[in-house]
Amino acid sequence: KFYDNEVDNYSQDHYQLHWNQRYNNNWSTTIGLNYTNGRGYFEQYKEDEDFADYGLEALDFNGEVVNTTDLIRRRWLDNDFYVVNATANYKDANIDLIFGGSFSHYDGDHFGEIIWAEFASQSQIRDRYYDGNSLKNDLSVFSKANYKLNDKVSLYGDLQVRNVTYKTFGNTSDLVDFEVNKDFTFFNPKA
């Protein structure tokens, strides 16, 4: 069956601020800020869908059990993403030294709605038949040094510590419950 409003309606807004400052011949700094807001859905007409796939109860319709329906659903994504980056740089004839850090935070909601059904069971318009949230934090600090021993030989070192945290909870579009709470820390040396 043709449905004339099967759409993918998603948009993002991006906001950025960049700042670079040179203090003298040796010192400089940078800061970058970013915010992205994304939201939208795709809409579909589905025929003969099982009530159980949407967490709905069967209906008794004039003595006949009805447990399927034609419906229109929307599957949503609504998220926010924040990033901060900062560095400080010292440079002279023999050494190039950079210190910095980065932090990002993602918060995403994923959910589904039935916006119309031939047989609605106990469902109301805009009820969520699945609903999940995901959070991710990523923090990193680093330092890099390049030391010139002479015109042909340099020493290089890079140290990074990174922490990533994932937290998710809710249920999937298949109505499977999930919960994740993981934290990872890494130390990444390079020479």
Features from the language model and the residues they span:
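Face-selective signature of the C-terminal outer-membrane beta-barrel domain
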Residues: 9-173, 180-186
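A conserved mid-domain beta-alpha-beta active-site/ligand-binding segment of alpha/beta enzyme cores
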Residues: 2-8
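Short, intrinsically disordered, charge-balanced linker/junction segments flanking boundaries
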Residues: 189-191
